[in-house]
Amino acid sequence: MLRIYADLTKFGIVVFSVLAGLAGYATGFQIENPFDWKIFLETLLGIYFLSSGSLALNQVQDWKIDQKMPRTAKRPIPSGKIKPAAAGILSVGLLLVGMNMLFKLEPVAGWVGLFCVFLYNGPYTLWWKRRWVFAAVPGAIPGALPVTIGYAVANPDIFNSESLYLFLIMFLWQMPHFWVLAIRYKDDYAAGGIPTLPVALGMEKTMFQVGLYTLVYVGVALAAPMFVHASWMFVLLTFPFVFKVLQEFYRYYKSNGTERWLAFFMWLNVSMLVFIIIPVIDKWNFLFIHHN
């Protein structure tokens, strides 16, 4: 039963969302304020329930499409492990719990969470993904908002440079992340009728877009000192990951997307975590030293 629940809520993606929320909260938190474990844990739980509910609802919305795709046909609903109605009730319950927690913690965080769910389960799932080749671009907005939700609980000023940096890293990372998978499973997406880049425009144009967004992504990471406090630690830890991401993309590109996809994919994911965690460590190290 736990396995079905984990698959329905896409637990692996939820973990990324919670980690992003943690980074957002830690970046927005002011060291002069008393740290409250209750608020901290409720923030992570709120993001967990919201993400789980939204992703489960997405499977309810897409189960007929998932049924046509070999990669997704074994998901809980198309495989018959759980009824769509039961999954729908569970997803709504999770969403309500998550929204309630976030609104109680900080109304700004609640509104950002509500907008996130609306965008992901509304326009993206129901229209953009099914009709638009570049749906991954606006679809990356809700995927990047968990970090903003976490930030908002600690600091409701979500339009400052710190919050913007975290959002941009999460946003830009998603395009190469998704399109690498779209290349890998392009036959599945074609079977499901989803017009992804490799299905609709071919490999050459898709690889160009992957490369373009990868360059912008690492460019923003290198520009972090313009957005957040950054010291020698930033330089020491960021540059090797930037180099490795670009190196793996080059190898991936030279194979025309047929080899090295997993190495590039994994380094993208690891680098994203590094790029949002380094500013947190750097800021807290700086504040702690100067506070004492």
From Swiss-Prot:
InterPro entries: Protohaem_IX_farnesylTrfase, UbiA_prenyltransferase, UbiA_prenylTrfase_CS, UbiA_sf. One of its GO terms (molecular function) is protoheme IX farnesyltransferase activity. It is found in: Cell inner membrane. CDD domains: PT_UbiA_Cox10. Keywords: Cell inner membrane, Cell membrane, Heme biosynthesis, Membrane, Transferase, Transmembrane, Transmembrane helix. GO terms for cellular component: plasma membrane. Pathway: Porphyrin-containing compound metabolism; heme O biosynthesis; heme O from protoheme: step 1/1. Its main location: membrane. GO terms for biological process: heme O biosynthetic process. Belongs to the UbiA prenyltransferase family. Protoheme IX farnesyltransferase subfamily. Carbon 2 of the heme B porphyrin ring is defined according to the Fischer nomenclature. This is Protoheme IX farnesyltransferase. It comes from Bdellovibrio bacteriovorus (strain ATCC 15356 / DSM 50701 / NCIMB 9529 / HD100).
